């Protein structure tokens, strides 16, 4: 059996709060089940909170943003792994700013996608070897904000660069009366079957 390299990306900014992070807890639970099924796989953890070079794209750095070597570092990492597990809470109807900065670094023409040789003008993803699992959390019920679906956004983004995206795991409704009093471990119990099934199939 081939050893798979798995990159686990966390993007929550609330890990250090007393309440903790639901999305990071979801990632940890998913990986707990994944490790049981795949004990020899190599796990690489990337917490975006610790990456000081993931600064926002602005007029101050636009001219050098894609040529300063930072994008290549993260793109090369993606090229070196077989699977990616990425987690994010919903923040203001989107994924986190940390994750936005990361995506700005890896979405680079002719490195992760290309329009060259495209017959109909559509993009060709350059990372078809990747298998991606998206794990998200949100306070609102699924589909509540029709204009802000961070899960679908992430699915489309990774499909755009050629990755095979597994069915996402979404812990939704966490701010509704049914779940709002629960801490992360209790909420995870309610979604446990979905998480376990996804991990076993990834």
UniProtKB/Swiss-Prot annotation:
Its EC number is 1.6.5.-, 1.7.1.17. FMN binds at residues 12, 21-23. Its cofactor is FMN. It catalyses: 2 a quinone + NADH + H(+) = 2 a 1,4-benzosemiquinone + NAD(+); N,N-dimethyl-1,4-phenylenediamine + anthranilate + 2 NAD(+) = 2-(4-dimethylaminophenyl)diazenylbenzoate + 2 NADH + 2 H(+). It is an enzyme of class 1 (oxidoreductase). Binds 1 FMN per subunit. Keywords: Flavoprotein, FMN, NAD, Oxidoreductase. Pfam families: Flavodoxin_2 (PF02525). GO terms for molecular function: electron transfer activity; FMN binding; oxidoreductase activity, acting on NAD(P)H as acceptor; oxidoreductase activity, acting on NAD(P)H, quinone or similar compound as acceptor. Belongs to the azoreductase type 1 family. Quinone reductase that provides resistance to thiol-specific stress caused by electrophilic quinones. Also exhibits azoreductase activity. Catalyzes the reductive cleavage of the azo bond in aromatic azo compounds to the corresponding amines. Homodimer. PANTHER family: FMN-DEPENDENT NADH-AZOREDUCTASE 1, FMN-DEPENDENT NADH:QUINONE OXIDOREDUCTASE. This is FMN-dependent NADH:quinone oxidoreductase.
């Amino acid at each position: 059996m081939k050893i798979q390299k798995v990159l686990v990306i966390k993007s929550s900014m609330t890990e250090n709060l007393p309440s903790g992070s639901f999305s990071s807890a979801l990632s940890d639970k998913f990986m707990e089940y994944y490790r049981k099924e795949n004990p020899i796989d190599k796990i690489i953890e990337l917490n975006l909170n610790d990456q000081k070079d993931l600064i926002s794209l602005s007029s101050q750095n636009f001219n050098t943003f894609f040529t300063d070597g930072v994008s290549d570092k993260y793109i090369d990492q993606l090229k070196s792994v077989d699977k990616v597990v990425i987690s994010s809470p919903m923040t203001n109807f989107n994924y986190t700013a940390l994750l936005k900065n990361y995506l700005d670094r890896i979405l680079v023409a002719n490195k992760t996608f290309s329009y060259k040789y495209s017959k109909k003008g559509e993009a060709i993803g350059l990372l078809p070897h990747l298998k991606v699992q998206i794990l998200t959390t949100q306070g609102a019920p699924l589909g509540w904000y029709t204009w802000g679906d961070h899960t679908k956004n992430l699915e489309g983004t990774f499909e755009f660069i050629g990755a095979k995206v597994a069915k996402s795991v979404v812990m939704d409704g966490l701010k509704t009366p049914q779940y709002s009093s629960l801490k992360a471990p209790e909420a995870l119990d309610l979604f446990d079957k979905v998480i376990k099934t996804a991990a076993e199939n990834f």
